[in-house]
């Protein structure tokens, strides 16, 4: 009944991944992002992650694997997904949804911390505001984007961009793969100093 549609979806996902992998720059950027985060941890910093919708879930996933574990038992790493419902509803109501992440960064972000922002379009105003505040506070910024990078293009210290222009789910599929690879590399790097 739907076998061809299923095969088509899987093939498109494989094609998007193959295109992403074919650009050696993407491989280098993943390594650069992992080392940036590990170096922040080694210096007493933390990661603050944010995104909207599915990207919000990915931001939470990243933080929980840092504070919990990925593949191996090891010490917990300092990470916070900006996802506290009372904070989000308060700031949305009092200031506007475009400030839900930047207000949190303003409150707890410090020099040497890392902002990990996700936006499949690169145009999420609340993530853009978070990037601007993070930079003002001397934080490093890693952005996972899609399409042409949108307004986030060129703003982050490390931008990992999925060059896919159709549906956000394909971009999110690569983002979660990148997150898992980052986790693996961070654990490798942190184990060197354990």
From Swiss-Prot:
It comes from the Bacteria. It catalyses: 2 D-sedoheptulose 7-phosphate = D-glycero-alpha-D-manno-heptose 7-phosphate + D-glycero-beta-D-manno-heptose 7-phosphate. Pathway: Carbohydrate biosynthesis; D-glycero-D-manno-heptose 7-phosphate biosynthesis; D-glycero-alpha-D-manno-heptose 7-phosphate and D-glycero-beta-D-manno-heptose 7-phosphate from sedoheptulose 7-phosphate: step 1/1; Bacterial outer membrane biogenesis; LOS core biosynthesis. It is an enzyme of class 5 (isomerase). InterPro entries: GmhA/DiaA, Phosphoheptose_Isoase, SIS_dom, SIS_dom_sf, SIS_GmhA/DiaA_subfam. Its main location: cytoplasm. Zn(2+) binds at residues 61, 65, 172, 180. Its EC number is 5.3.1.28. GO terms for cellular component: cytoplasm. Residues 37-194 form the SIS domain. Substrate binds at residues 52-54, 65, 93-94, 119-121, 124, 172. Coiled coil: none annotated. GO terms for molecular function: carbohydrate derivative binding; D-sedoheptulose 7-phosphate isomerase activity; zinc ion binding. Keywords: Carbohydrate metabolism, Cytoplasm, Isomerase, Metal-binding, Zinc. The reaction produces a racemic mixture of D-glycero-alpha-D-manno-heptose 7-phosphate and D-glycero-beta-D-manno-heptose 7-phosphate. Belongs to the SIS family. GmhA subfamily. Homotetramer. This is Phosphoheptose isomerase. The gene is gmhA.
